[in-house]
Design a protein with these regions (language model features):
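Bacterial N-terminal signal peptides
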Residues: 8-18
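Sec/Tat signal peptide C-region and signal peptidase I cleavage site
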Residues: 20-24
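Boundary regions of SH3-family modules and the immediately adjacent low-complexity/disordered segments
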Residues: 25-46, 96-135
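Short, basic/aromatic beta-hairpin or loop at an interaction surface
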Residues: 49-62
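SH3/SH3-like (including bacterial SH3b) beta-barrel domains
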Residues: 64-78, 86
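SH3/SH3-like beta-barrel fold
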Residues: 79, 92-96
């Protein structure tokens, strides 16, 4: 009977660890585009990173999922241009090029909603740091 108790305690500890790890490191959630329908651009509006604290980090983290626990993919500074493709609970799913470029293939209508796979980068940032500037 003692072995069963040890096994049960070990198993419950392992399950608790796995649950904690799952909460601490959520899986990636691809940014989707085409949510505006087949007649409108894949992502709107064209936006800019603003409102960062110049005395602080002065960047916004781009994350793999719409949560602060999501893996950091990149850091964007003030003035960086991005496309907002999706919004989820205070997070903006964005697409952005290497510079203030277009050519990310989100500026035209697409026939159906799909996960963004390139050619530019994508991820999630806090919506409070993204300000629409066009579209």
């Amino acid at each position: 009977m003692r072995k069963t108790g040890i096994f049960a305690a070990g198993l419950s500890g392992l399950l608790a660890f796995a649950a904690t790890a799952a909460v601490a490191q959520p899986g990636a959630r691809p940014v989707r585009y085409g949510l505006n329908g087949p007649e409108l651009d894949g992502c709107t509006p064209y936006s800019e990173i603003r409102g960062l604290n110049p005395r602080g980090d002065n960047f916004v983290s781009v994350r793999a999922a719409p949560t602060t626990a999501g893996r950091e993919l990149d850091r964007l500074g003030p003035g960086r241009k991005v496309w907002i493709c999706e919004e989820v609970g205070g997070w903006a799913g964005i697409v952005y090029g290497p510079r203030a470029s277009t050519g990310c293939n989100v500026e035209s209508p697409i026939p159906r909603v799909r996960a963004y796979r390139g050619p530019c980068r994508s991820g999630w940032v806090s919506s409070r740091y993204v300000t629409p500037i066009a579209g």
